[in-house]
Design a protein with these regions (language model features):
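Core domains of carbohydrate- and sulfate-ester-processing enzymes
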Residues: 102-152, 194-234, 303, 387-430
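Active-site-proximal N-terminal segment of extracellular/periplasmic enzymes that hydrolyze or transfer
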Residues: 1-37, 46, 83, 443, ...
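C-terminal, low-complexity/hydrophilic appendages and adjacent surface loops
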Residues: 297, 367-461
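Catalytic-site neighborhoods of secreted/periplasmic enzymes
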Residues: 55-163, 290, 365-366
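Substrate-binding rim/cap in mid-to-C-terminal beta-strand-loop elements of soluble/periplasmic
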Residues: 57, 229-237, 255-259, 263, ...
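Active-site regions of oxyanion-processing enzymes, predominantly non-cytosolic
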Residues: 1-5, 103-114, 120, 150-155, ...
Length: 495
């Protein structure tokens, strides 16, 4: 048995032909959908990048207990479990967060790994002097970082070395993935995880892909949107063209993997999972990107395609709710390994085969933001009560953040907390925290009916439906052994 994961970043399903888009040129995603089950209700869990990857390893939510950070000593790791069972696991990635403080122990769980440098503001190429930066329409406010450490500055330093398609990190990632398949296709018992940061912003690609779209933009350079939309309609259209161009580049590289699946008849004995960690807002709801606003479906409901050689389902749509916490149990089940007790996800074999549901509801969110729940029809977003936005704490035995250590003042306020039901009997550090994305809770509670309002333009007010969704939310939070202050923060009465 073999398996391949292709993991993209910030892939918005509304820009893919299998999900109804008529503008993006992505024939290989169409080709994939014809040879796999396509999921219409695949939701995020813990947001964004590394919290999602922690779910990929552990098969359980983590955003209620801690912000972005490393795997914990008590975390189960699917790639490591497979490795210990004699199944070779290999990671290929250009996802720069793996070599930041808060991601530095994920890749070590694989049998081997290959990293490609240069995406976004990866601190890759040195430039003591100022790199050449053209006039731009708008500098991404949250990305500048200040001084020589800022993502903005480093991204432009890197771009000097990324000019031809062969130079791009995405290309190099898929080169390495193809090399692995060429070398190992006849071997048995392996998992290959190929992941690229694209089509994450900045939307930088070659003219070959940009020329596929009728972009009439005549203004200054602009490929890195952020925050609230303040640009003209022309600028919004320009960004969407650049995003589509980058998706087309992703599509070409997806096709390279599909070609090798055909060439070596890997469809016979190889599971293929193609998905993303989260989506991306491209001006919808008046926002760019993610995190600073409610998790609308453009970010939360993501593309997912799975080929399972056991059921050999091709060209079918699946409506049942699934999440990234299901990927680890699905792969463990596929390789005939036990699914551990602390994993909350479910193996997806039955959904793939016959759309048999595995859950009533899906929990999702980001640490300190809304706690969201969906049953497939309704989405309920529960915000912190006014004045309680900062009533939250990190629970961890790895006191490291995304790209920084905890400072002395923060650690001076820590206390020792009793074990949770997933910490293997270990006590954990409780470190008081604050609302991470300023103002995210100010949107208040939101309830959407996806059947009548799939674009989530008109929140509804229905006490009976809200009460039912609150009960579902509380049940899922209890199953996750959520900290007591989460209920207080959200104004939930729990017996």
């Amino acid at each position: 048995m073999k398996a391949i994961i292709l993991l993209f970043d910030s892939l918005n399903k509304n820009y893919l032909p299998p999900y109804g888009d008529l503008l993006t040129k992505a024939p290989n995603f169409q080709r994939l959908a014809a040879h796999a089950a396509t999921f219409d209700n695949s939701y995020v869990g813990s947001m964004p990048c590394m919290p999602a990857r922690r779910e990929l390893h552990t098969g359980r939510y983590n955003f209620l207990h801690r912000e972005w950070g490393p795997l914990e000593p008590f975390d189960d790791s699917m790639p490591e479990l497979l490795k210990k069972a004699g199944i070779y696991t290999h990671l290929i990635s250009d996802h720069l967060h793996y070599w930041e403080d808060g991601g530095g122990n994920y890749h070590n769980r694989y049998s081997s790994w290959d990293v490609v440098r240069g995406q976004e503001g990866d601190h890759w190429k040195a430039s003591v002097g100022e790199p050449p930066i053209p006039e731009v329409l708008r500098v991404p406010q949250k990305q500048t970082g200040g001084g020589v450490s800022g993502l903005w500055r480093h991204d432009w330093a890197n771009r000097e070395y990324i000019q031809q398609e062969a130079d791009f990190p995405q290309t190099k990632v898929f080169d390495a993935g193809c090399d692995f398949i060429h070398k190992n296709h006849a071997e048995d018992n392996w998992l290959l995880q190929v992941e690229t940061f694209d089509p994450h912003e900045p939307f930088y690609t070659t003219e070959e892909y940009l020329s596929l779209y009728d972009d009439e933009w005549q203004g200054p350079h602009y490929d890195w949107p952020r925050g609230k939309v303040s640009e003209s309609e022309e600028a919004i259209a320009h960004i969407r063209c650049r995003y589509r161009a980058l998706v087309s580049m992703c599509d070409r590289n997806l096709g390279r993997i599909l070609d090798l699946m055909d060439e070596h008849d890997l469809w016979r004995d190889t599971m293929l999972i193609v998905g993303t960690d989260h989506g991306f807002l491209l001006g919808e709801h008046g926002w760019w990107a993610k995190n600073q606003m409610p998790y609308y479906n453009e970010v939360a409901n993501n593309p997912l395609f799975i080929w399972d050689p056991r059921s050999a389902v091709c060209g079918a749509r699946r409506q049942s709710l699934v999440q990234m916490i299901d990927w680890a149990p699905t792969l463990l089940d596929y390789f005939q390994q036990p699914i551990l007790a602390d994993m909350q996800g479910q193996p997806l074999a039955k959904i793939i085969a016959s759309d048999e549901p595995v859950r009533e509801g899906a929990l999702f969110g980001v640490f300190s933001g809304h706690v969201n729940v969906t049953d497939g029809r309704y989405v309920y977003m529960r915000a912190a009560q006014p004045g309680r936005e900062h009533d939250i704490a990190n629970y961890t035995l790895m006191p490291i953040k995304m790209n920084a250590r905890y400072d002395v003042d923060e650690l001076g306020k820590l206390s020792l907390a009793p074990p949770f039901n997933f910490t293997k009997g270990l006590q954990v550090l409780r470190i008081p925290a604050r609302e991470k994305y300023k103002g995210v809770n100010s949107f208040g509670h939101l309830l959407f009916d996806l059947r009548d309002d799939p674009q989530q333009q008109h929140p509804i007010h229905d006490e009976a439906i809200e009460a039912r969704m609150i009960n579902l939310l509380i049940r899922l939070m209890k199953e996750n052994d959520a900290p007591a202050e989460q209920y207080r923060r959200l104004g939930l009465d729990v017996v």
